[in-house]
């Protein structure tokens, strides 16, 4: 009967012997399975150390092939390693962006200057640039190739610190500024001369005057520690700081005022400008309003912006002339080659 007693099972006498035989065969089958497994276990146990060793080797081989496959997909190269804590990225591309769409950039740090201050408009590529540097540093230290041109040089840091993005904490009731400052305090406690520090919108989220002053003081502290640092900002005070302090350099993300769109090109040695007045004029804001707005800005700032605008115009003109000269050089070389071929 069943365990509940509600059902009775009847076995005809004619199949009792066959059922007993079936039961015996099932038991024999189970015993044979256990015997075979025990024998196989014994065989495996005798070479267990070899199997475990091979497993480790296969894992390393799989990892190496995976890195190679990733390198091919990113069109990456093996960076030259240096011990001087220098970064020299040639046509570096953010590894997570479409390789056919991302704009390559030349980024260098540590040889002529230890701190790079990047300015420019929002959505111009500042954050992508500093993330590229941070990812390249971590990829290098992980034994990965980097998506850049041959001749790019990287180094190994004891730590790569980064404060990027706006991570407000509702649970801890932290504002944007407090959230950033909490991270920065932790970074300054741990930073050494062998560290790379990355700040995004340093000093943002509070009064601009106090924020700029704090940003300068923080950069000075990082410099005193001897670390390499890249920071993005909108503050003119930081541009002036980079212009006047040794081992600190300005950089800007290029913006095309005519098309009102960023080019995503990084220009090291050139302070960026907000382009707010030019953009507003292009969008139709009346000139007298723009002129009135300029009256509310410190005269020194206006003069600096005018100088930057002239520098940018001269740079663009020089870039165009250089491109034309290179094209002319190619045409001359082609004509010379054709002439030499005909003489032969």
Q: In which residue ranges do the predicted regions lie?
A:
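Terminal-proximal interaction/regulatory segments of ATP-powered molecular machines
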Residues: 318, 322-344
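A structural signal for well-ordered alpha-helices, especially hydrophobic packing surfaces
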Residues: 26, 62-65, 188, 315, ...
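Short hinge/gating elements
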Residues: 3-7, 22, 37-47, 118-123, ...
């Amino acid at each position: 009967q069943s365990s509940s007693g509600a059902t009775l099972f009847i076995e005809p006498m004619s199949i009792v012997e066959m059922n007993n035989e079936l039961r015996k065969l099932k038991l024999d089958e189970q015993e044979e399975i256990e015997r075979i497994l025990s024998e196989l276990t014994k065989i495996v146990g005798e070479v267990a150390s070899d199997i475990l060793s091979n497993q480790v080797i296969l894992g390393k081989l799989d990892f190496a092939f995976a890195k190679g496959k990733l390198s091919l997909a990113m069109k990456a190269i093996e960076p030259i390693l240096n011990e001087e804590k220098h970064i020299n990225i040639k046509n570096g591309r953010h590894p997570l962006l479409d390789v056919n769409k991302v704009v390559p950039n030349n980024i260098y740090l540590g040889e002529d200057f230890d701190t790079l201050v990047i300015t420019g408009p929002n959505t111009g590529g500042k954050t992508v640039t500093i993330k590229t540097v941070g990812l390249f540093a971590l990829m290098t230290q992980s034994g990965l190739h980097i998506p850049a041109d041959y001749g790019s040089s990287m180094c190994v840091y004891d730590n790569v610190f980064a404060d990027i993005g706006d991570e407000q904490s509702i649970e801890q009731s932290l504002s944007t500024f407090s959230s950033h400052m909490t991270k920065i305090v932790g970074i300054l406690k741990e930073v050494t001369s062998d560290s790379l520090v990355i700040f995004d919108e340093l000093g943002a989220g509070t009064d601009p005057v106090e924020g700029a002053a704090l940003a300068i003081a923080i950069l000075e502290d990082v410099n005193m520690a001897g670390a390499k640092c890249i920071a993005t900002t909108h503050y003119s005070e930081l541009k002036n700081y980079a212009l006047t302090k040794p081992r600190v350099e300005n950089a800007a993300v290029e913006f095309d005022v005519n098309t009102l769109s960023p080019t995503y090109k990084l220009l090291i040695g050139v302070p960026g400008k907000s382009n707010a007045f030019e953009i507003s004029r292009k969008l139709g804001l009346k000139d007298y309003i723009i002129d009135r707005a300029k009256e509310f800005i410190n005269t020194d700032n206006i003069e600096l912006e005018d100088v930057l605008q002239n520098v940018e115009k001269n740079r663009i003109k020089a870039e165009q002339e250089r491109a034309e000269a290179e094209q002319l050089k190619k045409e001359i070389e082609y004509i010379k080659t054709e002439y030499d071929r005909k003489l032969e």
